[in-house]
From Swiss-Prot:
One of its GO terms (cellular component) is cytoplasm. Pfam families: tRNA-synt_2 (PF00152), tRNA_anti-codon (PF01336). GO terms for biological process: asparaginyl-tRNA aminoacylation. CDD domains: AsxRS_core, EcAsnRS_like_N. It catalyses: tRNA(Asn) + L-asparagine + ATP = L-asparaginyl-tRNA(Asn) + AMP + diphosphate + H(+). The keyword Protein biosynthesis applies. The gene is asnS. The keyword Transferase does not apply. Its EC number is 6.1.1.22. This is Asparagine--tRNA ligase. Homodimer. It is found in: Cytoplasm.
Length: 466
């Protein structure tokens, strides 16, 4: 007898007639007048449950089988047979059911077999993985995570684990979570009354990282091609469907690469990931197409078969100004493109993924390479139909004098970035990279529009439960 996952049964890993044991949770129980119960049991390994046909001849049929409700955990053993019913290839003729865990009160069980709003499920983050939608999101998220690591491994990149605690603000925006062990009731003070952070754990102000990029650059300038993949934090008080306080970022960094090189890398990576999901998680995608967004499969297939368009920011502004469409946010050179502008470019003008390049320097970070015109930097955004910006990247400023000028312009301390400046003093090299918000990628693939529903335990303003 073999212990089998439901996914392995449906993949045909076990021959018809095999004795198998499946361990999981009851999704539904249906009783027939002929003295047979049908148990739908899932274990999370794939979207569909497996049906167990349970005869009333089992010793515990009356005492236990007929009491099973959604959420009860069971170990079910029986013979694998071809299913005469529609919708599944196999089912089990059950010879034994062991109940390992009961639902205490089925009438008040929050995950009873009925449809719940996604907003309601957010309040039950510890139980929502048991639902179809969150289980499917988790499997797609896992698939995408593996695809990212596989892609970079095949491309010859080295994964680098950058620190979560840092003293530098990569974005220069100041929206950072402070890390401190100081006694808030008895803060040490300097002579001028300010908090004395020299008494703190690290001897200085420290924060949760907003990006692994700056640390990643140090390794790219020694190992040539690296990537980071880990959590990042933004203390941005935005209570929207697009923002989280804690989220995951994928950040490759490539030495001897310019902006066009990493634009090509971004295109290859996204297509690799989408092909992986289309090949490996078709069952979950079909659910999303049926219940969430009917265009998800078509959108991904179109994406992998499209060539990316490219346009300069200045030309994109002219396209938006002359298109005749009324936007909520006015369009003029120097603005940061809003979601409505990005989606118009990708969905209506180019009708394809598009890379917008060479943004005004005043709306971009200090580390982006200044172009010859002195007004723009070698920055890019990858815009995807259906969501807008999905990747942001840039060629890094490798010239020390220009970098110092940019730090001064933005009021940032050169002393704080002494180690980052050292990279430009010792064998400087052109290098480029980008950042991909992983949750935004999962949202795009699944069609689940609120980013709080594509991460297991969302962290947002006034929300850090579980």
């Amino acid at each position: 007898m073999s212990i089998a996952s439901v996914a392995s049964v449906f993949k045909g890993d076990f021959a018809v007639g095999s004795q198998v044991t499946v361990r999981g949770w009851v999704r539904t129980r249906r009783d027939s007048k002929a003295g047979i119960s049908f148990l739908a049991v899932y274990d999370g390994s794939c979207f569909d449950p497996i049906q167990g046909v349970v005869p009333n001849s089992l010793d515990n049929y009356n005492d236990e089988i007929l009491r099973l409700t959604a959420g009860c955990s069971v170990v079910m053993t029986g013979e694998l047979v071809e299913s005469p019913g529609k919708g599944q290839a196999f089912e089990m003729q059950v010879t034994k059911v062991e109940v390992t865990g009961w639902v205490e009160d089925p009438d008040t069980y929050p995950m009873a077999a009925k449809r719940h709003s996604i907003e309601h499920l957010r309040e039950l983050a510890h139980l929502r993985p048991r639902t179809n939608i969150i289980g499917a999101v988790a499997r797609v998220r896992n698939c995408l995570s593996h695809a990212i690591h596989n892609f970079y491994n095949e491309e010859g990149f080295i994964w680098v684990s950058t620190p979560l605690i840092t003293a530098s603000d990569c974005e220069g925006a100041g929206e950072m979570f402070r890390v401190s062990t100081l006694d808030l009731e008895n803060l040490p003070r300097t002579d001028d009354g300010k908090v004395d952070f020299s008494e703190d754990f690290f001897g200085k102000e420290s924060f949760l990282t907003v990006s692994g990029q700056l640390n990643g650059e140090t390794y790219a300038c020694a190992l040539s091609k690296i990537y980071t993949f880990g959590p990042t934090f933004r203390a941005e008080n935005s209570n929207t469907s697009r923002h989280l306080a804690e989220f995951w970022m994928v950040e490759p960094e490539v030495a001897f690469a310019d902006l066009n090189d990493v634009a090509g890398l971004a295109e290859r990576m996204l297509k690799y990931c989408f092909r992986a999901v289309l090949n490996e998680r078709r069952d979950d995608l079909e659910f999303f197409a049926q219940r969430v967004d009917k265009t998800v499969i078509e959108r991904l297939e179109s994406f992998v078969n499209s060539d990316f368009a490219q346009v300069d920011y200045t030309d994109a502004i002219e396209i938006l100004k002359s298109c005749g469409k009324k936007f909520e946010f006015d369009v003029e050179w120097g603005i940061d493109l809003q979601s409505e502008h990005e989606r118009y470019l990708a969905e209506e003008h180019f009708k394809a993924p598009v890379v917008v390049k060479n943004y005004p320097k005043d709306i971009k970070a200090f580390y982006m390479r200044l172009n010859e015109d002195g007004k723009t930097v070698a920055a890019m955004d990858v815009l995807a139909p259906g969501i807008g910006e999905i990747i942001g990247g840039a060629q890094r400023e490798e010239r020390l004098d220009v970098l110092d000028t940019r730090l001064d312009e933005m009021g940032l301390s050169k002393e704080d970035y002494w180690w980052y400046r050292d990279l430009r003093r010792y064998g400087t090299v052109p290098h480029s990279g980008f950042g991909l918000g992983f949750e935004r990628l999962v949202s795009y693939v699944t069609g689940v529009s609120n980013i709080r529903d594509v991460i297991p335990f969302p962290r947002a303003p006034k929300s850090a439960n579980f």
